[in-house]
Amino acid sequence: MSGPGLLVELLGEKLVNSEREEADVQALGSRVSLIGLLFGCGMSAPCLQLLPGLKDFYCKTRDRLEIVFVSSDPDQKKWQLFVKDMPWLALPYQEKHRKLKLWNKFRISNIPSLIFIEASTVKTVCRNGLLLVKDDPEGLEFPWGPKPFCEVIAGPLIRNNSQSQESSTLEGSYVGIYFSAYWCPPCRSLTRVLVESYRKIKESGQKFEIVLVSADRSEESFKQYFSEMPWLAVPYSDEARRSRLNRLYGIQGIPNLIILDPKGEVITRQGRVEVLRDIDCKEFPWHPKPVVELTELNAVQLNEGPCLVLFVDSEDEGESEAAKQLIQPIAEKIIAQHKAKDEDAPLLFFVAGEDDMTDSLRDFTNLPEAAPLLTILDMSARAKYVMDVEEITPEIVQSFVTDFLAEKLKPEPI
């Protein structure tokens, strides 16, 4: 499919401007090289606050890019009032299904969010577009394509004894990029565990280093927090480099631990979950598994997009492992297909046993108590898809997933 065709598939054939006049998406794809998808809501104070600065940025760069507003407004009149103040385009209000697909595709968890994509390929250029606008308000670094880790991290790194070393010393090592701050209680809790994980990994003979990218609000709090850590940090004074690292990995919240391989490629963005799950670090460097067991630690991933969850009777010994083996070939195939296109898989895959967390999930989503129970949960759309049969086979799972991806299944409300 051609570039404009990919954009039409993503956004539909028509967008609207502030006067509700239609704009042709295929023509848009031929006119600009970048599209900024602005996820927001007219009832959100942060969304209202960002408009003046974003308008200035847009006026300076509109010959090279277009912004498309993707609304979360529950009321069309409020949407119309908000869109009226925007110099850019918007997804039509009635395109609610397409809006949800965009939220899921780009793993939007909070608003406002601004995602820059290539118009020709619809591949993501920058996940943290609002930070990009703040860092480069004149658009001097356009087109902001992702740079390799070694280039973004380049420069001196420090230890808490004030010793300095060049970032080039990280070459050939696994690296954990740790986004954290003293003012954040979950960060401090994770740091205590991470100090022990760091020690165990180093003692096992692995070449591993952690680099702190601070989100502290003062140099004093940074120094106090960093004094507890045996690893490296980007100097607090180097705000530009800290910001570039946040942009590179699309950081939306802390704590966040990104694990890189010795070539600087991302192994997992779920370092926090892995450190807390694998206390002895026996599975380091924590390559992602196609199917994982749903726990309190990773349940937050249910909010990242549609998730296939197979509920099983965990009192039956070996049932969870058998369920994983049943799903795994299907999960691997889907993950590989989308990885080849440099895309995230459209589904995450979980097996859920019986515990308090699973009971709470069943209650929240109003699922029957049956086991096995095959479901797809889409929390952002508040929708569920349920396959309640006596026996779950690979053929049933494959058919269920295929029909979901083809949008042939009828959702039930959560």
From Swiss-Prot:
One of its GO terms (biological process) is negative regulation of Wnt signaling pathway. InterPro entries: NRX_PDI_b, Thioredoxin-like_fold, Thioredoxin-like_sf, Thioredoxin_domain, TryX_NRX_thioredoxin_dom. Disruption phenotype: Depletion causes significant defects in head formation with absence of eye structures. Its EC number is 1.8.1.8. It catalyses: [protein]-dithiol + NAD(+) = [protein]-disulfide + NADH + H(+); [protein]-dithiol + NADP(+) = [protein]-disulfide + NADPH + H(+). It is found in: Cytoplasm, Cytosol; Nucleus. Residues 131-305 form the Thioredoxin domain. GO terms for molecular function: thioredoxin-disulfide reductase (NADPH) activity. GO terms for cellular component: cytosol; nucleus. It is an enzyme of class 1 (oxidoreductase). The keyword NAD applies. SUPFAM superfamilies: Thioredoxin-like (SSF52833). Keywords: Cytoplasm, Developmental protein, Differentiation, NAD, Nucleus, Oxidoreductase, Wnt signaling pathway. Belongs to the nucleoredoxin family. Functions as a redox-dependent negative regulator of the Wnt signaling pathway. This is Nucleoredoxin. The gene is nxn.
